[in-house]
Structures are given as C-alpha cells and as structure tokens.
C-alpha cells in the first residue's frame, strides 16, 4: 500500500512539475516576445514623434515626415533676413542659428568619405542606416526644441545647404531655400564686418571670392540635384527690391498660407510668437530694420583693381548665377515704392538697436566653418 501510495504521489508530483515547467516556459516565451517588440520599437527612433505643447496648451507633433524648411547659403547672403521674414509668419518658427547642425553634418560627411573610417564603423555595426537614424533624431530634436513650437519649423544655419541632398533623404518632405547674393557684396560684407569663416582670409578679396565661388557652387549644384520642387534659389537683391512679389513666390513654394506680417518683420522683433534675435549674430543689427536697399551696393569702389579685372576667372559662379562680373555698379533692378520709403527712413536713423540686443553685437564673431 505504501509503495502504491508513494508511486501515486510521485506521479502526481511529476505531473505538477511538468505543468509548472510548461507554464513557466510559456511565460518566458511571452516575456521574450514582449521584450522583443519593445526593443524593436526602441531601436527605431525614426518612427517616433516629438510632442511639444505651446503656452496656449496647443499640442504639436513632429517627425521625420514633417515639412521642415532649411534656409542656407554662403554667409552674408541674406539668410538672417530670410528667416526673420518667415519668423514673422504666425505659423512659422525658425529661430537663431543652432551652429551645431552644420558641424554634425560635416562630421557625417567626413565619416562617409574616409574609406578606412567607414570600414571600421561598419565592422562595429555602426552602419549608414544606424548613423542616418541617429542624425534624423538629433537634427529633429535640436530644431524642434531650441525654440517655441509652431505648425511649421525651419532651420537657418548657412552651411547646412552644403548637405542638402543628404538632408532631403533624411527628411523626405523637407524644402530648401538657397539664398543667392552677388559674391562681391557677400565678400565685402564678410571683410568689413569681420565675419570669421574657417578657410576665408579676411585680408584678401581674391581669396575670399575664390572660397565664395567654391561654396556657392557646391550649394547650387545640390539645389539643382534635389530639383525645383524641393529647392528654391532666392536672390537676395530681388527679395530686397521686390519683397512682396518674392515672398508670395516663397510662400507658394513652401505651401504655407499668405500673411502680410512677413513684409513687416521689424514690427515683431522680440514679441511673443514673433521674431527672436540673438545678441551675438552679426546680422542682428541689420534685421531690426525693415527691408531696405542700404546694403545692396556697399561693395562698389572697395574691391582692388586687379581683382576686378580677374573677376570672371576668380568667381565664374557670378556669371552662372546671372550676375555681370564686370559691371561696377551692376543694375539689380528698380525697387518697389515700399522699399524706397523704408530706405529713406533707415538712412534718417529711424531704427535703432533695442537695448536688450546691445552689448555683444560688435565683439563676437561668426566662427562658422566652410568645410
């Protein structure tokens, strides 16, 4: 009887142990499945959204699919004016230069160009797919969180447009505004305002014009490669002479509804939901003024004669972009009456730098890289 009872208990115990084992096994499998799903979700940041809430408790969702706007060009080509005019729109926020985005883009480009470095990264599992996902997340985070939320976000870092083809792949619905300005004016502005740019010798017009030509050639070529539906060259001179016509074309290109506020950005400087300016950006003291012609032809009479004679060879992009390399002064066109009036008021001294923006404008230089 004892033996029989012992066998029964042993059999029952074995069955219970088997059931417990099966149950635990099922639980382990279920946990692994859940964890696998979580890991898969966590490892795909490009599918996630950033959620931000403004002061009125309106929620905004941002992702790689959003219609980001990138403004760029060679420094001193009107990028700050362009972003200030867009910033004046009630549904757009650009904000100050982040400075960091063009630098990480340059690093990403360097990793791709170096065959040895790319091989090391691939061996370590840091593939192009991994890097691109990280770049997407990083760039979106910086653009979204360095200012107030808005329906449309834009970024203005001049040299980002040296990577516009790459950015167009990271953000498939993004659009690009390439600011184009007479290189002679851009270079004269760099030199006289002491805007330090890596690789540019501010003591030499010839060197700066050569570097300008190289930089704008890269940006313009990438703009053409992206295509007219994604990248719009915006001529600074035409924006200044005909702001309303130019801004209508720009807003149509961006698919954003029209607002007259884009023609009066100076009235929204420092106001909530308006135009935020940096004390240390070199263009701040200019964009506090309305659109005017004051800076259009300041370069005339300052470029050395030997450089003027060789202009077509030093900067062939001038002719390619539609400028006459031998016209001194060139004929940029006739201004709208509004611009004429604005210019008279500026020359009279009607616009002064606000007290909250004084103190740093003349001592801090732009250290953007041309690489």
UniProtKB/Swiss-Prot annotation:
<dbReference type="GO" id="GO:0005794">
    <property type="term" value="C:Golgi apparatus"/>
</dbReference>
<feature type="binding site">
    <location>
        <begin position="76"/>
        <end position="80"/>
    </location>
    <ligand>
        <name>3'-phosphoadenylyl sulfate</name>
    </ligand>
</feature>
<feature type="binding site">
    <location>
        <position position="189"/>
    </location>
    <ligand>
        <name>3'-phosphoadenylyl sulfate</name>
    </ligand>
</feature>
<feature type="glycosylation site" description="N-linked (GlcNAc...) asparagine">
    <location>
        <position position="366"/>
    </location>
</feature>
<dbReference type="InterPro" id="IPR026634">
    <property type="entry name" value="TPST-like"/>
</dbReference>
<feature type="topological domain" description="Cytoplasmic">
    <location>
        <begin position="1"/>
        <end position="8"/>
    </location>
</feature>
<feature type="region of interest" description="Interaction with peptide substrate">
    <location>
        <begin position="99"/>
        <end position="103"/>
    </location>
</feature>
<feature type="binding site">
    <location>
        <position position="193"/>
    </location>
    <ligand>
        <name>3'-phosphoadenylyl sulfate</name>
    </ligand>
</feature>
<keyword id="KW-0808">Transferase</keyword>
<dbReference type="GO" id="GO:0008476">
    <property type="term" value="F:protein-tyrosine sulfotransferase activity"/>
</dbReference>
<feature type="active site" description="Proton donor/acceptor">
    <location>
        <position position="97"/>
    </location>
</feature>
<keyword id="KW-0325">Glycoprotein</keyword>
<dbReference type="GO" id="GO:0000139">
    <property type="term" value="C:Golgi membrane"/>
</dbReference>
<feature type="disulfide bond">
    <location>
        <begin position="223"/>
        <end position="231"/>
    </location>
</feature>
<keyword id="KW-1015">Disulfide bond</keyword>
<protein>
    <recommendedName>
        <fullName>Protein-tyrosine sulfotransferase 2</fullName>
        <ecNumber>2.8.2.20</ecNumber>
    </recommendedName>
</protein>
<keyword id="KW-0472">Membrane</keyword>
<feature type="glycosylation site" description="N-linked (GlcNAc...) asparagine">
    <location>
        <position position="341"/>
    </location>
</feature>
<feature type="disulfide bond">
    <location>
        <begin position="94"/>
        <end position="154"/>
    </location>
</feature>
<feature type="binding site">
    <location>
        <begin position="283"/>
        <end position="292"/>
    </location>
    <ligand>
        <name>3'-phosphoadenylyl sulfate</name>
    </ligand>
</feature>
<dbReference type="Pfam" id="PF13469">
    <property type="entry name" value="Sulfotransfer_3"/>
</dbReference>
<feature type="transmembrane region" description="Helical; Signal-anchor for type II membrane protein">
    <location>
        <begin position="9"/>
        <end position="25"/>
    </location>
</feature>
<feature type="topological domain" description="Lumenal">
    <location>
        <begin position="26"/>
        <end position="371"/>
    </location>
</feature>
<keyword id="KW-0812">Transmembrane</keyword>
<feature type="site" description="Transition state stabilizer">
    <location>
        <position position="156"/>
    </location>
</feature>
<feature type="site" description="Transition state stabilizer">
    <location>
        <position position="283"/>
    </location>
</feature>
<comment type="function">
    <text>Catalyzes the O-sulfation of tyrosine residues within acidic motifs of polypeptides, using 3'-phosphoadenylyl sulfate (PAPS) as cosubstrate.</text>
</comment>
<feature type="binding site">
    <location>
        <position position="236"/>
    </location>
    <ligand>
        <name>3'-phosphoadenylyl sulfate</name>
    </ligand>
</feature>
<dbReference type="GO" id="GO:0006478">
    <property type="term" value="P:peptidyl-tyrosine sulfation"/>
</dbReference>
<keyword id="KW-0735">Signal-anchor</keyword>
<comment type="similarity">
    <text>Belongs to the protein sulfotransferase family.</text>
</comment>
<keyword id="KW-1133">Transmembrane helix</keyword>
<dbReference type="InterPro" id="IPR027417">
    <property type="entry name" value="P-loop_NTPase"/>
</dbReference>
<feature type="binding site">
    <location>
        <position position="181"/>
    </location>
    <ligand>
        <name>3'-phosphoadenylyl sulfate</name>
    </ligand>
</feature>
<keyword id="KW-0333">Golgi apparatus</keyword>
<feature type="binding site">
    <location>
        <position position="298"/>
    </location>
    <ligand>
        <name>3'-phosphoadenylyl sulfate</name>
    </ligand>
</feature>
